[in-house]
């Protein structure tokens, strides 16, 4: 499972304050604890009205002061993403492209022929309401990727995880899309913002864990989540073992010994 740490995001009130006050220690700490908890990428999203690129530069520099975990450059503006890639000391992940506007034509050329990976959202001008429509967007994205020489193995498809409380069929459509994407392109990654599922609902951690298990069972192998949440990490390792993705439970045992989940050791 590829873990994309979600905690450095300006849409989170405490992070927004840290950005406004230029509280470097707060940002460094968020980077450090996510890296130590097992994040494979650290998502960095400024989420500011003005000066987004400058803010991303500041955030990325702070993250790189305390960890060499690759950066996930996160912005709704494709051109900002491409410029922010230049601040990273090593290739990471770009979040994101979609069929909206010219995003593919801006980001795909920037990562072509490099080790950079990319998150691709299954949407265009709006969010498709059916699995068939989302899979149609998937086909369009893959045609674009092929045209720019981007292999499927560098793409993390986001099927668009929406709030459970407004869903008519639970997560049935999302899991259908995940399974279909993996069937069409076995080497592609499927990701998603796990915590989206529980928005506006009580005891969110239970819903997040339940979603993670069901999505992984459908084929999701990447997730935007909080790696410092020990219960979530434990559930992830346990699910990998149950699905036969962890030979002899070696990853599960290793993560437990490292203290990534289970009772905290003194």
Enumerate the language-model features and the residues they cover.
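Active-site mouth loops of central-metabolism enzymes
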Residues: 3-29, 93-99, 125-133, 197-205
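Alpha-helix-loop-beta-strand connector modules within alpha/beta enzyme cores
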Residues: 6, 52-89, 172-192
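Active-site-proximal loop/turn and secondary-structure-junction residues that shape catalytic pockets
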Residues: 8-10, 46-50, 77-79, 98-100, ...
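Glycine-rich, proline-tolerant flexible connector loops at the mouths of alpha/beta enzymes
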Residues: 35-69, 161-171
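Catalytic beta/alpha-barrel core
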Residues: 43-48, 69-77, 91-102, 119-122, ...
